[in-house]
């Protein structure tokens, strides 16, 4: 069995993520999806909790026709020691044989650790970007909904994610500034 690794923050998950995961699953038997920065939430870059991201990702993948029995979702908190990063994430995961990333820095760390790295499938990178989707939410551009599965949009509505982002950007969501 070949198990692949795909790391992201998924803030929020969008169709590009779903399509990338489907493409990865065409090459491997199972995919481990690491929800990185698991400890961060309620900040502009990471507005959703890890629990919300697991929920959104599972529902988005289900909506996209992904066989969830082939998917392992694991939240992993960041560490500030890049040299120890790979050992850190491996301690959270079952074994994997290949990793998919579009991030050159992550690819470097993985390769230095002896991991086979493949280019992450990317679908219309200019359109399907979580940062852009969050910016659209903040600006009141409702077309962000076209970029995420309907189930993800419903969850964002349920947790009042757009309202949360708008409060977060006021700066009051940064305890280190209080």
Curated annotation (Swiss-Prot):
What molecular functions are annotated in GO for this chain? ATP binding; nicotinamide-nucleotide adenylyltransferase activity
Record-given protein name: Nicotinamide-nucleotide adenylyltransferase
Extract the Pfam families matched here: CTP_transf_like
Q: Where in the cell is it found?
A: Cytoplasm
Q: GO biological process annotations for this chain's record?
A: NAD biosynthetic process
* EC number of the protein: 2.7.7.1
Q: Which cysteines are joined by disulfide bonds?
A: none
Q: Which domain of life is it from?
A: Archaea
Tell me the InterPro entries matching this sequence: Cyt_trans-like (IPR004821), NMN_Atrans_arc (IPR006418), Rossmann-like_a/b/a_fold (IPR014729)
């Amino acid at each position: 069995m070949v198990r692949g690794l795909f790391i992201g923050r998924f803030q929020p998950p969008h169709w590009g993520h779903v399509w990338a995961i489907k493409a990865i699953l065409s090459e491997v038997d199972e995919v481990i999806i690491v929800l990185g920065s698991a400890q961060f939430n309620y900040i502009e870059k990471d507005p959703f909790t890890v629990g919300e991201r697991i929920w959104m990702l599972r529902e988005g993948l289900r909506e996209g026709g992904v066989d969830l029995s082939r998917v392992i979702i694991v939240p992993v908190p960041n560490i500030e020691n890049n040299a120890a990063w790979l050992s850190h994430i491996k301690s959270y995961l079952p074994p994997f044989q290949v990793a998919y990333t579009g991030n050159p820095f992550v690819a470097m760390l993985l390769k230095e650790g002896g991991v086979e790295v493949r280019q992450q499938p990317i679908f219309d990178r200019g359109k399907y970007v979580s940062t852009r989707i969050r910016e659209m939410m903040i600006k009141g551009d409702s077309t962000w909904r076209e970029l995420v599965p309907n189930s993800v949009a419903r969850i964002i509505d349920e947790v009042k994610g757009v309202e949360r982002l708008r409060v977060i950007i006021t700066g009051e969501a940064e305890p280190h500034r209080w």
